[in-house]
Amino acid sequence: MTIAELFAPNQTLAGHLLALLDNQATDTAHDLAHLLRVWQNVRKISAVEGGNLTVLTAATLLHDCVHVPKDSPDRANASRLAATAAKAALTKLNRPEQEIAAVRHAIEAHSFSANLSPKTLEARILQDADRLDALGHIGIARCFAVSGALGRPLYDPLDPQADARDLDDTNFALDHFSTKLLQLAGQFQTETGRILARERHAVLMQFYEGFLNEVTLS
């Protein structure tokens, strides 16, 4: 089976879009494996909630097509830039205007940094599917992979839980759990997404509490 065939019945569209992504440099948290995990989440959610799989195929494959580093001052614009690039790519493929508009909105609204409300079912599904990948075991791995790539320490050895300092996930990987990851489960858009998120949130909490138990100085 090819990668494009994983997106059946939209494997032809997927093949065209995957070809556009072949030469794009990206970090390990937003690579092809991430796209496939998000697609798996999309399928799980849409199997219950519904949604247009053609729109979801394109939105999944293109939602990170413009890479803006996590430490960039332009990070909040990443989803808008990706949505603009997605529109251009789909226009070249002569996709219907209504489909392009739906894909563009889903991409714009998926990002935590963009802080936009998803207005369509497809946008809600993509946002949930992408955020699920920030939770659970894979979310833990992605958090530390990104922090390591940015040269950030794992935690503050004198105050790992930030009891006497401000949380700062630009300096400590563990702080990202409190500033973002542990808040995500309450922000899901679909009932199916919320169910899946609760399971992965429990994994995060178990890891976080165990980590603190091992590193907190007595």
What are these regions, as identified by a protein language model?
Residues 2-5, 24-49, 62, 115-218:
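Divalent metal-dependent phosphate-bond-processing catalytic cores, especially two-metal-ion Mg2+/Mn2+ enzymes
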Residues 4-20:
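Short alpha-helical hairpin
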Residues 12, 16, 57-60, 102, ...:
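Generic alpha-helical secondary structure signal
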Residues 38, 78-91:
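An active-site-proximal "capping" alpha-helix that borders the catalytic cofactor pocket
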Residues 53-72, 78, 82, 103-111:
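His-Asp-centered metal-binding catalytic motifs of divalent-metal-dependent phosphohydrolases/nucleases
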Residues 69-74, 185-189:
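A short secondary-structure junction motif
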